[in-house]
């Protein structure tokens, strides 16, 4: 068992950056958090605010080094973001060690990918799925099963009808849908509020939450 643990700590992680801030998006907004940004994404979203994290090339660090770096921070909530976390086969090792060290774990994902070894941890973490606002967008069934919320970026192309896809109905019914105005732009805030009002008439309550960290000029 100890030998396996040592081997896992030698696992190389494609890491973009680690930093402490507040969670500025979604249902856990305001929570003091340490962000682990993994390097590499399978999508190319036009409004992506982290283009430097898209490529799969870049520095790699041992998991043991990452764990040591986390000890410099005071927050005990970890947000694994990217890039796309589920594009990394090493993700289960990261989550396992974080949970064993007493951290709470949140993963921000575009929802298109899944790593089977994550199933044993999925119930005990907070998965935030951010589907893109187009009708034919695919979300992996396991992500839909374990996600705690759906977060949609409301941009010029976003349509309310996307929210009514059959696979999203549970989240609408349970009030676990967040509309995030693109880049906190005024016209997108107005659009999100309009959609929220229309959905209220259909007995669905969604939340409109801007990128709060940007309001405080935080990372």
Curated annotation (Swiss-Prot):
Keywords: 4Fe-4S, Iron, Iron-sulfur, Lyase, Magnesium, Metal-binding, Queuosine biosynthesis, S-adenosyl-L-methionine. Pathway: Purine metabolism; 7-cyano-7-deazaguanine biosynthesis. S-adenosyl-L-methionine binds at residues 83, 130-132. Its cofactor is [4Fe-4S] cluster; S-adenosyl-L-methionine; Mg(2+). GO terms for molecular function: 4 iron, 4 sulfur cluster binding; carbon-nitrogen lyase activity; magnesium ion binding; S-adenosyl-L-methionine binding. Its EC number is 4.3.99.3. CDD domains: Radical_SAM. Pfam families: Fer4_12, Radical_SAM. Binds 1 [4Fe-4S] cluster. The cluster is coordinated with 3 cysteines and an exchangeable S-adenosyl-L-methionine. Belongs to the radical SAM superfamily. 7-carboxy-7-deazaguanine synthase family. This is 7-carboxy-7-deazaguanine synthase. It comes from Aquifex aeolicus (strain VF5).
